[in-house]
């Protein structure tokens, strides 16, 4: 085989905002729990989209997160999303002389977007068409209760697609 392999990706690239020690049995989270499958509420181990969740709760995501977390900031921020994470892993294990890994996408011109852009630039992935635009950075709020299920732990996920909608 001659020539360089080029792997290009577009899709889910976001920040994961991890909140540790969220008590899934607390009064703060109870109003936001799912009552039946697919209703837009929170369910252990499952992801819900921001639009569905806000409709279910009748409140903005920022207000809901503040209520659930007691207004505290997330404990950890990471690069997330299956598209970019798999591309980063591929770029880390391949020879850059033989394989070029590229990503195309969007994030917001907010602090999370600046974090994401800065973090992505430290990876071996080539940001071919990655721009910060006037929209919210795609994010997943990860609520973690390590005591849930008799100490086995579990997470609940709320995804905001934000600027990713604007990639054309």
Regions found by a protein language model. Give the residues of each.
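Glycine-centered loop/turn motif at secondary-structure junctions
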Residues: 80, 94-98, 121-126, 162
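Short, electropositive alpha-helical surface patch
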Residues: 105, 109-124
């Amino acid at each position: 085989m001659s020539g360089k392999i080029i792997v290009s990706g577009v899709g889910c690239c976001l920040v994961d905002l991890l909140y540790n020690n969220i008590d899934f049995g607390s009064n703060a989270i109870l109003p936001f729990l799912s009552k039946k499958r697919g209703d837009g509420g929170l369910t252990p181990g499952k992801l819900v989209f921001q639009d569905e969740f806000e409709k279910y709760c009748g409140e903005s995501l920022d207000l809901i997160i503040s209520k659930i977390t007691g207004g505290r900031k997330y404990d950890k921020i990471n690069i997330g999303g299956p598209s970019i994470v798999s591309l980063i892993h591929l770029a880390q294990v391949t020879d850059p002389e033989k394989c070029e890994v590229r990503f195309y996408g969007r994030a917001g011109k907010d602090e999370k977007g600046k974090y994401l852009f800065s973090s992505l630039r430290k990876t071996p992935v080539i940001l071919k068409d990655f721009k910060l635009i006037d929209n919210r950075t795609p994010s997943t709020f990860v609520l973690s209760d390590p005591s849930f299920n008799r100490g086995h732990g579990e997470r609940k996920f709320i995804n905001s697609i934000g600027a990713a909608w604007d990639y054309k």
